[in-house]
């Protein structure tokens, strides 16, 4: 029996017989569906323990992707249920991110190339700002670490005990996965946490502090990526425009 987990105009997700199937609307671009499946399989090939891709199919003109189903709440749901454990949850979130960033797949899209195209396509930014952003982007170090691209509590599935202690953790929705600089992915998640929890929440700061502490990374280095990922994210979320100012005045 199908159990629907989510429904929208463009896609729906249901669980049946231990498998999760994402069904896309007939109007959904076929190449986007196939790209999502390809990216997921490339993350698997990199050795990351994620729900495995099982099938790509088309039924009645609707494309679908079927994967293993991992039962459990999202990290967002766990934070809402056990707010007093948020610090531990954020640390677990960072530890898992660090673990998959140690992996890589040379077939994944290069993050800096993707961001270059995104920034160039943004109509909200004038050419002088674009030039400054692209100059900084080109100066950033080239890495090949696995970056999720949309790593946030809504895309993290956990297994927890009766007291809310996390036993296992995994991530889903790897369609935006790339190879690139780990700090860029951290800056992107920091922005997503800001958009999700708001400026008054201390969760974003605790997240970025945990990463810097666990990896011995300077906060200033992660900060250099903030206006870049904020600008790139404008192609998906117009709310991100309020964060492009984070370090823009210091761009030289």
Can you name each region flagged by the protein language model?
Residues 185-215, 230-241:
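Active-site activation/catalytic loop segments of kinase-like enzymes and analogous catalytic loops
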Residues 102-149, 153, 157-162, 166:
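An alpha-helical support segment within catalytic cores of ATP-dependent transferases
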Residues 9-33:
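ATP-binding glycine-rich loop module of kinase domains
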Residues 54-63:
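Short beta-strand micro-motifs within the conserved protein kinase catalytic domain, predominantly
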Residues 244-250:
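Conserved small/polar residues in nucleotide/adenosyl-binding loops
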Residues 62-73:
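Conserved short submotifs of the Hanks-type protein kinase catalytic core
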Residues 76-111:
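Conserved kinase catalytic-core helix
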Residues 47-55:
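Conserved HxN/HPN-centered segment at the entrance to the catalytic loop
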């Amino acid at each position: 029996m199908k159990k629907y987990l989510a429904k929208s105009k463009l896609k729906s997700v249901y669980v049946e017989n231990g498998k999760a199937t994402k069904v896309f609307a007939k109007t959904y671009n076929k190449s986007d569906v196939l790209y999502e499946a390809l990216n997921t399989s490339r993350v698997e090939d990199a050795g990351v323990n994620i729900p495995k891709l099982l099938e790509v199919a088309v039924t009645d003109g609707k494309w679908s992707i079927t994967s293993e189903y991992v039962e459990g709440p999202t990290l967002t749901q766990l934070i809402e249920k056990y707010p007093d454990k948020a610090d531990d949850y954020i640390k677990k979130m960072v530890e898992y991110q660090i673990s998959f960033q140690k992996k890589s797949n040379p077939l994944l899209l290069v993050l800096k190339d993707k961001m270059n195209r995104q920034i160039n396509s943004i109509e909200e930014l004038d050419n002088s700002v674009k030039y400054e952003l692209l100059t900084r982007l080109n100066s950033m170090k080239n890495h090949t670490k696995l970056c999720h691209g949309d790593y946030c509590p809504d895309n993290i599935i956990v297994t927890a005990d009766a007291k809310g202690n996390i036993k296992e953790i995994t991530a889903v929705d790897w369609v935006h996965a790339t190879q690139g600089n780990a700090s860029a992915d951290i800056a992107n998640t920091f922005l997503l946490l800001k958009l999700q929890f708001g400026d008054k929440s201390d969760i974003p700061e605790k997240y970025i502090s945990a990463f810097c502490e666990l990896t011995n990374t300077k906060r200033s280095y992660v900060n250099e990526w903030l206006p870049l990922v904020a600008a790139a994210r404008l192609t998906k979320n117009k709310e991100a425009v309020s964060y492009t100012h984070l370090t823009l005045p210091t761009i030289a």
